[in-house]
Amino acid sequence: SHQEVVPTSLRQQGRGGLKTPPLSRIRSLLGLILLGALAWAFSVDRSKVAWRVVLWGVGLQLIFALFILKTPMGAGIFDWLNTVVVALLGFTVEGARFIFGDLVYNNVPMGVGEAATNAPIQEMPGQVARTGASFAFNVLPTIIFFSALMTVLYHLGIMQWVVRGVAWVMQRTLGTSGAETLSAAGNIFVGQTEAPLMVKPFFETMTMSELHAVMTGGFATVAGGVLAAYVGMLLAYFPDIAGHLIAASVMSAPAALVMAKLMYPEDGDPVTKGQTNIQLKSPDVNVIDAAARGAGEGLGLALNVGAMLLAFIALIAMANALLG
């Protein structure tokens, strides 16, 4: 089981077991101030910065963090989300087993234990040897499954309701336009390719500040499939990791708008100012079509992730060899 192979020091770093030293909190505060100052310093027009967006954006992050960490209701939601994601990872294992059979390492933490294969890599640490196979047969299939699941939820209209709710809160507090806010909220759940498609009809009329906010929101969060992949990689070490990552993704949405509006303040008149009731239509005919399209998109993302890891790790190894 996980508890038998994971060091105690790592198992204790869940939501209740990890204590943040005061110095780390001060460092985080200084980092927040420094990053904000840098964004303001590089702003295209510092005189037009809307400080309402900045103050409310930071405030929303603090409010959400306090709700999750300091209230029983928030902690309950946190734990429930963690349980749901972990259960979904179990469903991924069933699909991966059908394709890969015994190559799927169920209930074995990635990166822990002896070498997983008899390949000539026994001189490498067992942690490294196990990681590759587990990543390929456990983590990458997770991206495919979650991509299909999110596409189905969008087709059924469930995710639209959630995204509109988050967008409504941010739009009412930050005062940003409906299109950029909706895209930022969508990035919490889907990737930076899919989220902007929600507001595609407004691209031609968007201001430069709005387009900048849409791009920033994409880089500030991760797609649902990638988030699930991170959960699969870290679950053995941090039992509450899913809740942590979901909380971080939600908090990153207003943070992205803060940074975007500091660097490129709004100087125009957005068409969707004050609107969040934008129709989000699914292009799929039925649930099967949605699942198939989502799986195909997830496959492309999984292949890209695997290819990038292979290429960059190999390049880093080559650089290390050249540097001696």
Task: List PLM regions with ranges.
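Interfacial loop/helix-cap signal at membrane boundaries in integral membrane proteins
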Residues: 17-21, 69-142
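Structural signature of hydrophobic alpha-helical transmembrane segments
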Residues: 22-32, 138
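Cytosolic juxtamembrane amphipathic/interface segments immediately preceding
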Residues: 41-45, 121-131, 170-171, 195-205, ...
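Alpha-helical transmembrane segments
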Residues: 143-147, 242-259
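Juxtamembrane inter-helical linkers in multi-pass membrane proteins
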Residues: 163-198, 269-290
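Alpha-helical membrane segments and immediately flanking helix-loop junctions
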Residues: 171-234
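Long, contiguous bundles of hydrophobic transmembrane helices that form the permeation core
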Residues: 250-303
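Transmembrane helical segments that form the transport core of multi-pass membrane transport proteins
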Residues: 296-324
